[in-house]
């Protein structure tokens, strides 16, 4: 965590944490292209970079839906690099079907208190986070999309317990977060109380650009191409064809990702382009890492101390990026969004 925070402090001093945000909230007032380039570069360099949950998800959502109090409090602490955010959406029985969340947020109008009880899972960086944006059911007996609220809580509040979940790549970036009588107030609700569904969906559009996968894919492809050159594999016809094909597909996904991010700045509608770019970016990233893994297959079958850092990174990333078609909304859900919202097809 310390290197991440130290890096954020350096970026903060140059006001590059959120360059496209208004100056009053610590940004530079630049166009979205600066933020895109920055995110892609951080991913390419495998750098901890910015807090993507804060800078690219809840931050833009607060800018769009938040109150003056929320903007002043939460946006400035993000651009000062003081906090790490995490996302509280998925539950043990509510993943792709997000509207089925059951975590309760009982609202007491007398003392303006929301009492939260429930369990969230697959919470990336929950063990490091200072704050969480969480989707809860604040209207008793409500069903599906109705009666939901997007609420901000402090991870140090009484009643918040974080349990790490170890994944196949050996890391524990995912967590289970148990919430037992966690209290917050309506001033920490983004948008209107009980009407958070569309706010929560709009937030996902900020997440689903796929720009990180572009940076990671570019880095892996450059590295494996260098490896092939150094080990006399580059003249192999199959290797050359695969490298060329992957490079072309990556560039296509990159253009789609840029387009999706640009369209998001032009209108407020929840559209299909972020879903399209997420599918393309995650799938090409998986293909690139599969290719790299196959090239190195004799060297990277298990984690052990005899492997060089490059081989270890390829293996770890290959195992992790398999989840790209699940994280942030499954590929199947993205295809449904494209069909229904983009092409007007029936459910």
PLM features: what roles do these ranges have?
Residues 1-11:
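Single conserved hydrophobic/aromatic residue that forms the stacking wall/gate
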Residues 12-81, 125-131, 207, 250, ...:
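Internal helix-loop-helix
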Residues 33, 37-38, 57, 199-206, ...:
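Glycine-rich phosphate/cofactor-binding loops in nucleotide/flavin-utilizing enzymes
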Residues 81-89:
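A short, Trp-centered hydrophobic/proline-enriched beta-strand micro-motif
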Residues 101-102, 113, 117-163:
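A short core secondary-structure module
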Residues 103-107:
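A structural signal for short hydrophobic beta-strand segments in well-ordered beta-sheet cores
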Residues 160-255, 324, 340:
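Glycine-rich beta->alpha junctions and the first turn(s) of the following alpha-helix
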Residues 240-244, 272-278:
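Short, charged, amphipathic alpha-helical segments
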């Amino acid at each position: 965590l310390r290197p991440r925070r130290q890096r954020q402090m350096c970026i903060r001093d140059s006001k590059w944490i959120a360059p496209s945000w208004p100056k009053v909230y610590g940004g530079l007032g630049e166009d979205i292209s600066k933020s895109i380039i920055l995110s892609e570069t951080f991913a390419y360099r495998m750098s901890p970079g910015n807090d993507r949950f804060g800078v690219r998800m809840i931050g833009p959502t607060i800018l769009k839906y938040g109150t003056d109090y929320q903007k002043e409090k939460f946006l400035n602490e993000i651009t000062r690099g003081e906090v790490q955010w995490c996302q509280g959406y998925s539950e043990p029985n509510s993943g792709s079907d997000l509207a089925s969340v059951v975590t309760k947020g009982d609202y007491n109008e007398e003392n303006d208190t929301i009492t939260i009880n429930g369990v969230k899972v697959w919470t990336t960086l929950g063990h490091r986070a200072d704050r969480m944006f969480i989707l809860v059911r604040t209207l008793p007996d409500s069903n599906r999309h109705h009666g939901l609220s997007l609420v901000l809580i402090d991870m140090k509040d009484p009643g918040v317990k974080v349990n790490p979940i170890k994944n196949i790549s050996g890391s524990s970036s995912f967590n289970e977060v148990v919430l037992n009588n966690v209290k917050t107030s309506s001033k920490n609700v983004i948008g209107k109380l009980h009407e958070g569904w569309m706010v929560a969906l709009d937030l996902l559009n900020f997440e689903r650009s796929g720009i990180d996968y572009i940076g990671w894919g570019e880095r892996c492809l450059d590295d494996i191409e260098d490896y092939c050159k150094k080990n006399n594999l580059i003249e192999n016809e199959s290797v050359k064809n695969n490298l060329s094909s992957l490079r072309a597909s990556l560039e296509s996904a990159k253009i789609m990702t840029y387009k999706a991010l640009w369209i998001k700045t032009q209108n407020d509608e929840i559209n299909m382009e972020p879903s399209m770019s997420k599918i393309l970016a995650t799938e090409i990233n998986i293909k690139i890492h599969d290719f790299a893994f196959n090239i190195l297959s004799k060297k990277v079958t298990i984690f052990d101390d005899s492997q060089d850092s490059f081989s270890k990174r390829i293996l770890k990333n290959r195992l992790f990026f398999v989840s790209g078609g699940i994280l942030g909304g499954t590929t199947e859900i993205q295809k449904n969004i494209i069909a229904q919202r983009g092409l007007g097809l029936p459910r």
